Amino acid sequence: MNKEKINDYLQNRNVVMFVTSLFFMLGIFAYFSQKEILIACVSMLILVLLLAFSLIGVKRALFIAFVFYAGFALTMFRVKTSDELVPYAPLNAQFYGRIVSIPNSAESDKSKFFFEVEKIGNNHVSGKSLVTVSAPENMIQKLNIGQKILIKGSLRKPFISTNPSQFDYSKYLRNFGTFTVLYSDKGEFKILNEKMPPKWKFLNSLNNVRNSVLKTHSKYLKSPNLEILGGIVFGDDAVAPPDYIKASFINSGLLHILAASGMNVAFIFTFWFYILQFLKIPYKPRVISGMLVIILYTLMTGLGASVIRASLMLLFVLAGKLIDRDAHSVSLLSFVAVLMLLYNPAYINDVGFQLSFMVTFGLLTTANVLVRKFDKIPNWIKSIVFIPLVAQFWVSPIQMFYFNTISIYSVLANISTVSLLSVISFMGFVSSVLAIIKPIANFTCMIFDYINNYLLTILVWISNFFGNLPHCIVQSSHPEIFQLVIYYLMLIAVTCLINESKYKKTVITLLSVSLVLFCTTLAPVSKDLEVIAFDVQNADSFLIKTPQQKYFFIDTGKAPYRSGSSQAKIIMLKYLKDRGIKNIKGVIVTHFDNDHSGGTCDIIKNEKVATLYLNNANPETQTARNIFKTSKEIHQKIKFVKNDNIIYKEPNLTMKTFKVNIGGKDASNASSTVTLLSYKNFDMLFMADAGVVTFNRIKHNLPHNVEVLKVGHHGGPNVVSKSMTDYLDTKVSVVSTGINYFGHPNKGTLDILRNTLILRTDMLNSVKISTDGNIYKIYSYDNQDKKYKIKETLHAKK
């Protein structure tokens, strides 16, 4: 493509608006990424290059630079970094305030909502918290947006990312101007009968209408069909689907069906418009009333980013129709993006915002070009094939970035459901609108839901079919930001080349960029032994990587609390997925206490584990019973550890287990599996929850020089002694601990270890030890820069 052609593209109104909005977004992204200097330098360099090649003028370059810094400044001044609730956390107290979001949960006895706190006890405060409340279903159903409530609960700060690849819940909640979480497990709340301001009364009434419609549907549809229809009509921000349905739709690539989007908005407006046309209402009143209906529908859905985007675009298009002005598609999309970010810059971190705009941009550009180029193919075939295909190309990198997965059959699943979904959506919208009219609500829903019930069952069957096919989901490593940029630049270039009918250059571009992307994934393989101590609070989980790239876990952290996720799922498995690690040589479960074995089921279900090493065959706890049950279901190979037994060898490296039987009230801890890892001159001893008594039984089989000691039982009492540290001559002590009620680590234990370098996960976050067998380096995880930073370099004794 020559310079003149590029210049023509850059003068296009759509391109001008798109580039301007892109630099505005870059300014916002620079603030959130905390790489403002780097991004500013790269952005200004791009403008300088465009100027140097005379592709843009000086005035436009200065204006775009201004837009970039305006985006950064806006974000800096608009985004809060704290509120008045933060100094109070942690605190158990009674809170007074207003529910400011639609209460929502996938479980009938639990609800989540944002809560504007006005009082803590008798103290006046101002702040917003995310509430999770558990209570009987009849109490949960009474909660509604706009209500003033009194609630007793525990105010906490959300967890931050203290491990590589870990989801940062604190950072996520900051996008909503929220810096604390409030848990109420006993349903100790009271709804107050206070007069609502007009704004909240209106939103409350609107949500009552939505709930009334869903309640009418519930007479004729049962779970999961009810939640699926509710998600299609009102979006998953307002109606949460069951977890197993969500998992099925993720595997099949159909999850977007459950999110309100442009299709929903278009259906609502079209239905309203043609009803009024049938009633012979004039054109302008039809359009204006339709715009009001769209606004009401958007408020009813819970205000998800995708439905806001679709609604704003349609509203601007309709406003243009009223004044005889046509909107340029990409310009309008760019303008809406800027408008949303002006209102809330944190939208840029919202996955729904990113997916919605990326898919829409792809459909307006790539799909539009393909439809024009293949003009001999019937439009209905092009719509069925090109739309899901192009959408998949544009969203796949984002899915890989956030979820480490690619749905292989997504395009086929979407093609299979296009017609079906159109019928379900139309009938769902029509019946829901008519259900607002009380006298005909039951009759309407009974007729429409009778048919929809069969169609929804077929939809679930299609999702399960594609979601259960072999290799339906492929795990991917975590792409870097620059790789995403290269990929999307390639898509834009390919779209432009196809538009110009330059197919040979299209193929060359695809091959060249694919090669570049492949090269960026290549990295030198470390030949060192590496041990990672994950920060799993007052629990244990260690990942060992041998010089021959074999992976072992020693313990797997805690099990899920209530309906949450295990530490293995949110920390360790995410780490493995980001690095494309799919095979684990062995998992050593030192004993069946929940804080050591709670994540085992998730590990063996999601990774290919060659051998599961268990401490004993006694299903003494619920966690143990779950492990044996899951192992049987998936045919997991199990070995029971023996005392002084080598379980793995490779050149210069051995891994040995020790197991002694000790009775008494602390038998489980004292009898837990001890592991010795040796590589050349380097040794590390993992004591699990065992202490001095256990050590004295096995010390005759241990070396006198152990460089690193993983201290037993989170640094509790009686886990080390002076004679033990003298015997091992330990230089480094690792204590895996966090907030607890047991006094871990014990002061006496820390006194004994004071002559060693103490590495506490509650202070240093995740810790990594890397060694070539002679020199070992110690790193701690920096949650600001999101990487390990070196702390010490030491020499192993010969």
Where in this protein do the model-derived segments appear?
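N-terminal leader/targeting segments
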Residues: 1-90, 205, 309, 357, ...
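Hydrophobic alpha-helical segments
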Residues: 1-33, 320, 430-465
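Membrane-interface helix/helix-cap signal primarily in integral membrane proteins
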Residues: 2-10, 68-256, 570-577, 583, ...
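Hydrophobic alpha-helical transmembrane segments in multi-pass membrane proteins
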Residues: 15, 19, 56-65, 182, ...
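Residue-level signal for inorganic ion chemistry
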Residues: 27, 97, 352, 395, ...
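Non-globular, low-confidence helical/coil segments that flank catalytic cores
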Residues: 138-154, 172, 178, 195, ...
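Short hydrophobic helices that act as membrane-entry/anchoring signals
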Residues: 200, 204-218, 226, 379, ...
